[in-house]
């Protein structure tokens, strides 16, 4: 197969054949130690999977694959995962800051400052949970749980994408 064939398959909407060609290129480059090129074709192969899901009107899987592309470049970009992690921490911090009485300082009883919101978000995201600042009310507790689960997922994904870069 040639790269021209892939372009023709994509233009014609034959995403399965394009995916097969991308997979062959990926495997060929990987077996020859050209890991950056293999990564490119791995991403292209995954994009064809997503396009096939769109063709088949399987929008649930299409959405998951699109989300996976955005946050990690289909598992090929540790930088994307890191940027998603930073963005998530900042968004959760802003959400907590916008909630009146959302957090409480258990140690000093003082008002929560802007840096405290960021600190709480990092501690919750990384699931350290020192207990000095705690969520108050059901909404703040649910947001904390959501952030902690997001943290576990994204930290695991970061380890996987970094490992793929180091091992290959």
What are the language-model segments listed below?
Residues 38, 95, 162:
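Hydrophobic, well-ordered secondary-structure elements that form the walls
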Residues 1-62:
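N-terminal leader/targeting and pre-domain segments
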